[in-house]
Curated annotation (Swiss-Prot):
Biological role: Specifically methylates the pseudouridine at position 1915 (m3Psi1915) in 23S rRNA.
CC per GO annotation: cytoplasm
Keywords, ordered alphabetically: Cytoplasm, Methyltransferase, rRNA processing, S-adenosyl-L-methionine, Transferase
Binding annotation for S-adenosyl-L-methionine: L76, G108, F127, G128, K129, L130, T131, M132
Family the UniProt entry places it in: Belongs to the RNA methyltransferase RlmH family.
Organism name: Lacticaseibacillus casei (strain BL23) (Lactobacillus casei)
Protein name: Ribosomal RNA large subunit methyltransferase H
EC number from the UniProt entry: 2.1.1.177
Amino acid sequence: MNIKIIGVGKLKEKYFRDGIAEYLKRMDKFAKVKIVEVADEKAPENLSEAEMADVKAKEGDRILGKIKDKEWVIALAIEGKQRPSEVFAKEIADLGTYGYSDITFVIGGSLGLSPAVMKRANDTLSFGKLTMPHQLMRLVLMEQIYRAFMINIGSPYHK
């Protein structure tokens, strides 16, 4: 299985990079995991609705440029589908069973994802109504993907 995580912006803090590196190492035996960063659009404070839409569209174009046709895309969004870890694990396993070996997760920038990215997504995922920095969301997502693999092999990691 190939898993790609596309995120807007760079990870600046070493502790986030270290956490992600740890989960990349742990998942190496289950999947090939690739992190892809796309540039965030520099935007001043107090943007108008039109300016916010323009920022999301530009970031969205960069994201879409990193997605191949055959990839199953899951967009992370506050309004996405919430599910327990066990259900998420089963969905990941089922995707592999049904021939989707390339799964791409997309994390937007500070303004969220563009309508074009949401339209391209095959599914959505939400970890709740909380707003989180995209750097933290990458780490949380990595842990949940790892947890899914642990659930699927019956490991005591998930209690």
